[in-house]
């Protein structure tokens, strides 16, 4: 058989989710260090460049070119090939972040142990729930003063509604941080500060009651560890592979990414427990990752901000089969066959032309405006993958033209940008406003600058009285007509002409939902 299943089975595709400042960039960097993808940590651009605010944002994009190198990184670890998908944090936050989570088989959740569960983490976890994605948890920043570890586990369980199974347990924190104890292996790994940029051998003490442990961490901390572990082992969950795969239980690791400690523990967990590339639901059937014929779907489109190169790169997750350079694929939505000879792969940060890729891998397709989010490519079969959602935006602005004669170009530009997933556009039924919706502020700046460079339309955005939006449907035609008649001032069409309810306040939305129980208000919609 020409299709090597061992290639598929050794792949692990995951994303990191966290609140800004929980240490995601540092972890990404340390993970690449362990995967031998970079030689010394400190080469992933992180906070140092955070001073680039909005004003020099275009310049920043030019420096980054397509910030594609940090979007997907592939590296070997243990006997696996790991694909790490970056989910932009901070101001880059957009629907892309959400959609990236639909293209992975597991996630690493990073929590700042001094702060606990934060708002962005909660939002991202909601998205992983759409597909019950398995979650591994890393409690970061133990080299600082942290909250009580038992309290942290309780918070994850109560707020994120997922059971915790601690795999390692911290000994002290802040200046007194001495290391972690591995519950399953009955070993203590001792921490040495100042080892952040390279990988050093760690001293291991075997056995919890080994007198060597008391010498290494001090009598008080050793005693405290034994007492805490009695409590923890009595009260917490054992790790169960089955519950983990269903997204009901998360293994928890403690460490400090900055001090390069504990990162290898969760990587071992990831390669050992995280699922290999999974099957995926399409409209007509389920596609298994072991199938020989190629199939894949586009989950993200990255625009290049360099006006000289209007290339955009469509990120495609390979679901089944093998991509080979120069192969002919069917672009199902438009029914055309295309030869793909210059797909990109992402080996450890280099943008290289792909010779081959297997299920679980991510490849980049050059897109000159024909590819949309959610598009499926196959080796001839007509099917469409489902589960690539649009999310109800949380921020809204009205877009206004400086030159009113360019209304047509503006609409064309906005619809194309919405197909690409850069922003969502809404046209109210009762006026000629154009309202754009996003989940991150930066998206508005992107839209205005791209309208100018790509469509030659000068536009500005201004505040608009919209708090939230929901897609609406109703099985009862008569009731739906009445709803539409009475709520016309709150209705709009989105970029794909789907009817949307635009609410000025959350109270208004809640009242509408109570008043019209037969109308369904959706927070997400299929692409």
Swiss-Prot record:
It holds the Pfam family EF-G_D2. This is Peptide chain release factor 3. GTP binds at residues 18-25, 86-90, 140-143. InterPro entries: EF-G-like_DII (IPR053905), EFG_III/V (IPR035647), G_TR_CS (IPR031157), P-loop_NTPase (IPR027417), PrfC (IPR004548), RF3_C (IPR032090), RF3_dom_3_sf (IPR038467), RF3_GTP-bd (IPR041732). Belongs to the TRAFAC class translation factor GTPase superfamily. Classic translation factor GTPase family. PrfC subfamily. Disulfide bonds: none annotated. It is found in: Cytoplasm. The gene is prfC.
């Amino acid at each position: 058989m020409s299709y090597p299943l061992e290639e598929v089975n050794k792949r692990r595709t995951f994303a990191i989710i966290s609140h800004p400042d929980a240490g995601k960039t540092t972890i990404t960097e340390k993970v690449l260090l362990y995967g031998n993808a970079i030689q010394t940590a400190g080469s992933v651009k992180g906070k140092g460049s955070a001073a680039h605010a909005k004003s020099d944002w275009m310049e920043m994009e030019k420096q980054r070119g397509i910030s594609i190198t940090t979007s997907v990184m592939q590296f070997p670890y243990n006997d696996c090939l790991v694909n790490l998908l970056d989910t932009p944090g901070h101001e880059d936050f957009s629907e892309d972040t959400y959609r990236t989570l639909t293209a992975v088989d597991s996630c690493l959740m990073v929590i700042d142990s001094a702060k606990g569960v934060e708002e962005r983490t909660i939002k991202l976890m909601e998205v992983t729930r759409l597909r019950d994605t398995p979650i591994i948890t890393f409690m970061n920043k133990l080299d600082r003063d942290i909250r009580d570890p038992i309290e942290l586990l309780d918070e994850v369980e109560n707020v994120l509604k997922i059971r915790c199974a601690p795999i390692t347990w911290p000994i002290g924190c802040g200046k007194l941080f001495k290391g972690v104890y591995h519950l399953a292996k009955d070993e203590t790994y001792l921490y040495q500060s100042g080892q952040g940029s390279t990988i050093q051998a760690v001293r291991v003490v075997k056995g919890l009651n080994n007198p060597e442990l008391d010498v290494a961490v001090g009598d008080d901390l050793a005693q405290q560890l034994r007492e805490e572990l009695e409590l923890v082992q009595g009260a917490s969950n054992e790790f169960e592979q089955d519950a983990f795969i269903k997204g009901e239980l998360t293994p928890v690791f403690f460490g400090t990414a900055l001090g390069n400690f504990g990162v290898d523990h969760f990587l071992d967990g990831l390669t050992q427990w995280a699922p290999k590339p999974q099957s995926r639901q399409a409209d007509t059937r389920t596609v298994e990752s072991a199938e020989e014929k190629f199939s894949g779907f586009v989950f993200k489109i990255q625009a290049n901000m360099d006006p000289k190169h209007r290339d955009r790169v469509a990120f495609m997750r390979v679901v089944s089969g093998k991509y080979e350079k120069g192969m002919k694929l069917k672009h199902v939505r438009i029914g055309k066959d295309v030869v793909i000879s210059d797909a990109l792969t992402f080996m450890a940060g280099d943008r290289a032309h792909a010779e081959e890729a297997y299920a679980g891998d991510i490849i980049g397709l050059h897109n000159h405006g024909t590819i949309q989010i959610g598009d499926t490519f196959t080796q001839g079969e007509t099917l469409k993958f489902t589960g690539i959602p649009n999310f109800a935006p949380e921020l809204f602005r009205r877009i206004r033209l400086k030159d009113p004669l360019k209304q047509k170009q503006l609409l064309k530009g906005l619809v194309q940008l919405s197909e690409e997933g850069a922003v969502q556009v809404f046209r109210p039924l009762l006026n000629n406003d154009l309202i754009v919706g996003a989940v991150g502020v930066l998206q508005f700046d992107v839209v205005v600058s791209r309208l100018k460079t790509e469509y030659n339309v000068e536009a500005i955005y201004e505040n608009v009285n919209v708090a939230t939006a929901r897609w609406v449907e109703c099985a009862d035609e008569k009731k739906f007509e009445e709803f539409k008649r009475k709520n016309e001032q709150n209705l709009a069409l989105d970029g794909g002409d789907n009817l949307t309810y635009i609410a000025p306040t959350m109270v208004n939305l809640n009242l509408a939902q109570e008043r019209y129980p037969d109308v369904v208000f959706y927070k997400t919609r299929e692409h």
